[in-house]
Amino acid sequence: ITVFVVAILLWLNVLTLAGPSFSLCPAGQPTTTVTTTGGNAAATVAATGGAPVVGDMPAQTAPPTTANLNAWLNNFYNAEAKRKSTFPSSLPADAQPFELLVINICSLSWSDIEAAGLMSHPLWSHFDIEFKNFNSATSYSGPAAIRLLRASCGQTSHTNLYQPANNDCYLFDNLSKLGFTQHLMMGHNGQFGGFLKEVRENGGMQTELMDQTNLPVILLGFDGSPVYDDTAVLNRWLDVTEKDKNSRSATFYNTLPLHDGNHYPGVSKTADYKARAQKFFDELDAFFTELEKSGRKVMV
């Protein structure tokens, strides 16, 4: 689910640590960074400009009993509850506008990519940052999207994903306060499992779903719902945002052409995963190539 979104989360939430070629922070504003470090000893939280303090995370050295695992997990949640990315209150007058496109892909892991023979696909040449050694710790599309949309705060339990969070936890709200226009796109109708409802109620995305009228349907989900062509959806995004008077935009795009059970119209058998993955990677590669040629300042 998160191969294509983990890098963006890190980038957005450590802007004050290194920063992109264009800064989101007002010129001259001091930065504060918080880094969690691990090892055999207890985790240490180091804050710039201050003395290191001992964190709440214990070493993972105790026997893996139920009690120890539960205790470690609870300590993890307690430590995560203190984590938050602080955004600037405003942008400087000379801040360079850019667009942000977050692509949230269902049913795609490094193991899937390897099995589909796509580890050397040209798509990877477009990436500046890749993370290959991680556990997304997500159970399904809904929780994964909520965690992504609440990326400005630390991780919570699955149960608490469906409880209100502090206002400053919602990533796209934080960007909206800095003048970024929100856009919401989906490669499906968002109805199964109440996905669209979860994105709105638990992820804080209240903007209207981008128009899906006349988008070509390339697949049907296991519930018979339409799965739209990604190239067509992304091209519509290009058209909509290009007409937008605001040159700063932040878009969340959830797509599921690789979801288990997807099949071609008129065919009941599940479509071959490898063929779907190849097509999807080819489409993203072509889209990124055209985006680079356009000269638009877009971070994907």
Predicted regions and their residues:
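Transmembrane and membrane-interface helices of multi-pass
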Residues: 1-53
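Active-site-proximal alpha/beta segments of enzymes that process anionic O-linked groups
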Residues: 21-34, 52-268, 275-279
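Extended hydrophobic/Leu-rich segments
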Residues: 44-45, 73, 291
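Metal-dependent active-site segment of extracytoplasmic phospho-/sulfohydrolases and closely related
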Residues: 101, 279-300
